């Protein structure tokens, strides 16, 4: 595509580049949330010793808000303070997009305010799951061995081939800083 674009003077089609970047982001999210059981690494949603909250029906009443408060109470009980982040599966994120009676606010807005702005949706959690973390470096971090790089592999059949490479590992230092809703 690069060669053809150069020859005819047209802009390069970056669709494949965008798709590759998206695939890398999805794999990184999967590593962070599910870990790599084959290699013996835990993810946030699979960590042994993480605090588990039996999730109520988030499509009803203020159940989601109440469940998140339970998670934050756990952090308070364990004296964990700092930045909080809540990651939810796409189906749960959709359930949070409804007005709460007598507040005039979406439940997602209330929860986002409760956790200090850190509300994220990720397909890496699958369905009907959420993870709340106290995202401070003393609790967890992402160890980067090799940051994301792109290497030129050569050309074949008028296409230029590249390899995208990264090594990273989630390091959970304090499992009390992870709350799994499921």
Give the positions of each predicted feature:
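Extended, solvent-exposed, turn-rich assembly/linker loops in the middle of proteins
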Residues: 45-110
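Short, catalytically relevant binding-site loops at active-site mouths
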Residues: 37-41, 90-95, 126
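Residue-level signal for secondary-structure boundary sites
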Residues: 28, 94, 170-172
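Long, histidine/aromatic-enriched segments associated with O2/redox biology
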Residues: 18-24, 52, 83, 108-113, ...
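Sequence/fold signature of self-assembling virion shell proteins
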Residues: 99-182
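Alpha-helical scaffold segments that mediate packing/assembly in large oligomeric complexes
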Residues: 4-70, 74
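Residues forming anionic-ligand binding surfaces in small-molecule and nucleic-acid pockets
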Residues: 1
